[in-house]
Amino acid sequence: MAQTLSFNGRRRVRKFFGKIPEVAEMPNLIEVQKASYDQFLMVDEPEGGRPDEGLQTVFKSVFPITDFSGASMLEFVSYEFEPPKFDVDECRQRDLTYAAPLKVTLRLIVFDIDEDTGARSIKDIKEQSVYMGDMPLMTNNGTFIVNGTERVIVSQMHRSPGVFFDHDKGKSHSSGKLLFAARVIPYRGSWLDIEFDAKDIVHARIDRRRKIPVTSLLMALGMDGEEILSTFYSKSDYKRDGKGWRVPFQAETLKGSKTLVDMVDADSGEVVVEAGKKLTPRLLRQLQDKGLKALKATDEDLYGNYLAEDIVNFATGEIYLEAGDEIDEKTLPIILDAGFEEIPVLGIDHINVGAYIRNTLAADKNENRQDALFDIYRVMRPGEPPTMDSAEAMFNSLFFDSERYDLSAVGRVKMNMRLDLEVADTVRVLRKEDILAVVKMLVELRDGKGEIDDIDNLGNRRVRSVGELMENQYRLGLLRMERAIKERMSSIEIDTVMPQDLINAKPAAAAVREFFGSSQLSQFMDQVNPLSEITHKRRLSALGPGGLTRERAGFEVRDVHPTHYGRICPIETPEGPNIGLINSLATFARVNKYGFIESPYRKIIDGVVTKDVIYLSAMEEAKYYVAQANAELNAEGKFVEEFVVCRHAGEVMLSPRDTINLMDVSPKQLVSVAAALIPFLENDDANRALMGSNMQRQAVPLLRAEAPFVGTGMEPIVARDSGAAIGARRGGVVDQVDATRIVIRATEDLDAGKSGVDIYRLQKFQRSNQNTCVNQRPLVAVGDILNKGDIIADGPSTDLGDLALGRNALVAFMPWNGYNYEDSILMSERIVSEDVFTSIHIEEFEVMARDTKLGPEEITRDIPNVSEEALRNLDEAGIVYIGAEVQPGDILVGKITPKGESPMTPEEKLLRAIFGEKASDVRDTSMRMPPGTFGTIVEVRVFNRHGVEKDERAMAIEREEIERLAKDRDDEQAILDRNVYGRLLDTLRGQVSIAGPKGFKKGVELNNAVISEYPRSQWWMFAVEDEKVQSELEALRGQYDESKSRLEQRFMDKVEKVQRGDEMPPGVMKMVKVFVAVKRKIQPGDKMAGRHGNKGVVSRIVPVEDMPFLEDGTHVDIVLNPLGVPSRMNVGQILETHLAWACAGMGRKIGQMLEDYQKHLDITELRTELVDLYASESHDEVARFDDESLLRLADQAKSGLSIATPVFDGAHESDVSEMLTRAGLHTSGQSVLYDGRTGETFDRKVTVGYMYMIKLNHLVDDKIHARSIGPYSLVTQQPLGGKAQFGGQRFGEMEVWALEAYGAAYTLQEMLTVKSDDVAGRTKVYEAIVRGDDTFEAGIPESFNVLVKEMRSLGLSVELENSKLETADTVNPLPDAAE
């Protein structure tokens, strides 16, 4: 038997239903973010040897900066980062940005310029390190901390630079003719469009300006008309042959055309092909084989052809005809009269080769390079008179200047591929050859050769990740800075300055700040649970600067494309206006150095599927035949079926097995992380799977997390990579554990420079961005032996290192008194009383004491006109105690603000004069709990400005913090001492000593007894004979001293930070933050969901005894509506329910066996059952467990067996039936249920089982809202709207109709006036109510006045006339409304 395994019970072992072995390791899920930013900063690269990437390139592209006269130059040497001032946690607490100071070494070179020759010689060189602002650092979890909040930079999808060929789909012209166009898109610089118009003339546009003929562009590149024609067309010579002409036979040009007249051999005179025949390649080959060299042609055949060269009289220099002119009845005699026997003709036949470029040249008004350049200059800078120099300089700067134009490596690679060029990817500007190749390719497309590009193909879209976005932003900042530096260099005495004096780093720092603070791609991290964090970091957005906008994005961009397979998830995308524009990276996908998304494949060599994995981008994949991961293989790794389903060039087909070159790595490689967490995804409709993926991201972490019975095997990966569950950084032994930290003595990876101790601080009840609770719990005990990567602590929504978003609840699918109508959920009271779906939310309240004009505000317990009862929770500093239970209206922090002095009466002045100064007026501006919030205070933080005296509470918090730091230092010191003195003792033992502490005899052999007579600190005094050992001792001593001083230094730094005052916004003297933990039990109105898009609202909570129950008396927890399944087609929830029911049954069975074992102590039966149960092709570890491990596993499984059914490779119906049978349950998965109210059985059996339910972050407590008296809008005087503004309910148009329909006139009047915006009426009603009177009079609503004012502003005179009606007998009938 193989080596036995021990199982520590700190992870969950799942029965695995997948058949396909995992060949490739899944890449780290936040690799996209980390790799990209590391490549940008290159912190670990040596300063001198950094490659030209990221920050290094930015500096190199902007520097050297030369002043306007050329007398001095500022060069970039290198850059380095200093250690950040505060660590991640300190930044979070103090609302700072986690960043490292960037120091750049610059070299200023001053030249002497010889006035006569203009030669430069170096006069002076100065080098200096200059501070260039702070550069934000990424945390280990792939986020940034900006002003104390965690943010994520989302990667952007954009069109790759390069050349694209497209047509207008026949929309531009009424005839429906396809107009082809090519567009060269650089990474930065001017766009070049080359396009056909309806008359088949080729135009060029620069930056979408006015179009110019493409021949003008070519002339500007230095070509003349004849050269342009010879570039685009072949040439054939017509030679005079008696009366007719002789023309060379060219098989290529004739392919596929029809003969209009007989083809006659010029040499023999015989007819080789008759008129009206099609020239097939076979026929042409036969003619070539026969030796046909030339054909006979008449004058008529010459007509309609175009001259390939100018027809010139060389004697006089007279040009008879120019290249490109048409030969017809008028021009042919001119040529013949001039005595030309041979006419060069362009190879245009209007069928295979069109005359587009020739026609464009004929239509082009520009004759030469100067005209063309002037024309381009006028287009780009209308209104400026061109000169040759300015026009040439402008044209060169458009496409050929690396400062202004950058194709980027990607753009060059794409151009090379599309145009079949071989140019190094360091050539990042356009060349004349590139432009010619683009025009040629475009003309060929018009001639019907080649294909247009699909811009939605992932080969043509690339990802810009953090590093690249940051690089572009920093470049902008440096360019702004460059202008300022140039000006300063020219205006200052350059001989006396240092680089520091020239540089103002503000623009660069501002660019960074602006990017992280306000860019559309820098987003507040979605931190509801670990899954939402990971998904946010893997998100790809097509929006943002330089991307699409929601309004303009069409259907094609949003749609799923065949190249998305294995790269972008086809399921996970938001519902609503952003659908398809925001996507998620697939599980195995990664981004390559060019920014294209790659997916992994297994190689197939000689028909055998190997374990070699290669990553391919969409472009590279197109040429392969790729089999799916679930294709059946035999033992040798060959395909079983003769024909295999595979993908090729975006199509799915059946292909013979020997044509297949690659195979997918895993069935879950085509979906994203969130979709891969849905078991039985293959049985759900795509729309519901989309909702399921999106709703898992909104799951609130519960008080007690519980991993699902039915998982997919992705759960531990998400928990680990998100950083929610803590893994051991290196192997070791647990030395100390409490709720707030774990101390591990490392046994692996003990480098000289590293400490031998790892201290893990656990987060306790911290607030996340979405107010959910982040709390970590240790899983290890003192003495546990750990390997690297073992999970040592659970975080929010994790259970034994598995992601656990919800709870397993016993559900029944049946109607129950209409309480589950329209997806409502009926719930048992047990769930409330046992806190099954209870969650903790943490709210943060912040109060600042500012320095006002009237004097400073003060935080104090001494508040005017407040009862002692209201102050019961405050300490002497006026701040609430930790642990206090608070409710709406309770004071959290007492604060008073000086009030403006009111003018004093003479009597007051007299009293003042007699009794001295009375206390200045203050008003109470304390912070109170908002309405509807109850909770417990869990943390208070006090921040003081530098130089402001700290209050008692601040001192207490500071002392506590310093004690905590000291404890950490002492523990680390103790472990260090234990390790070092242990090694010292081992080294000394058995050695002969030549020196020692005071009173020690030389020459004694050292042993434990001898050494331990002396205190440990004196052991270093021993010296031994063996020189090698002596040098080891000295090295150990040096290492120990260094570690000790490093530890002490670190402690001192941290203490200094704690004691130092805090940086505050201007005018703020003191700030207090109070954190309140709110316990939210589930209640009617809360939204819940399963993992299959089955969402609903809790409608009623029923006493346990009224809920339906099973034969053994177990009451179900939740009753769901069976009608929610058929129309939604998410059958996965039913399969999950059945399988989880079997898991619970198996758990009971294993529990029974455990009890039997405890009676008889015979483990054989339990071992057989478990080994058989967990046996799987890909997981056989349970068979190797020792007895103790087996008992631990059984203990874990007795509450319900955990299983994994991976997506697209999970349990089948037969597996579900087998599990049910094994657990001793009916294979239908249905049970007899009894009505809890009557005790009678229901008519039919009901589907009962466990479903994994999650509580979503849409809680009724956050939404319910009522208003008494509140704020009004300034202009309309109507109440504000929304809970945040304490607003009113909108009584809209349709509600008014309803009251009109009922004829409730007075209610309606009240709604439109005194309850809304009749200002005077409101006051009167209030007074009337105070008086006890219940009558009121409505006035004019303010909104009517607003309307009148608006009409007046449009110049309409609106007057309100109050004319009395005449007496009753002479009443005029009112005019009819229609008149």
Swiss-Prot record:
Cellular component aspect of the GO annotation: DNA-directed RNA polymerase complex
Swiss-Prot/TrEMBL GO biological process terms: DNA-templated transcription
Keywords: DNA-directed RNA polymerase, Nucleotidyltransferase, Transcription, Transferase
Disulfide bonds: none
Top-level EC class: transferase
GO-annotated molecular function: DNA binding; DNA-directed RNA polymerase activity; ribonucleoside binding
Enzyme Commission (EC) number: 2.7.7.6
Catalytic activity: RNA(n) + a ribonucleoside 5'-triphosphate = RNA(n+1) + diphosphate
PROSITE patterns xrefs: RNA_POL_BETA
SUPFAM superfamilies according to UniProt: beta and beta-prime subunits of DNA dependent RNA-polymerase
Subunit structure and binding partners: The RNAP catalytic core consists of 2 alpha, 1 beta, 1 beta' and 1 omega subunit. When a sigma factor is associated with the core the holoenzyme is formed, which can initiate transcription.
Similarity remark: Belongs to the RNA polymerase beta chain family.
Purpose of the protein: DNA-dependent RNA polymerase catalyzes the transcription of DNA into RNA using the four ribonucleoside triphosphates as substrates.
Name this protein carries in UniProt: DNA-directed RNA polymerase subunit beta
Source organism per UniProt: Allorhizobium ampelinum (strain ATCC BAA-846 / DSM 112012 / S4)
Phylogenetic classification of the source organism: Bacteria, Pseudomonadati, Pseudomonadota, Alphaproteobacteria, Hyphomicrobiales
Name of encoding gene: rpoB
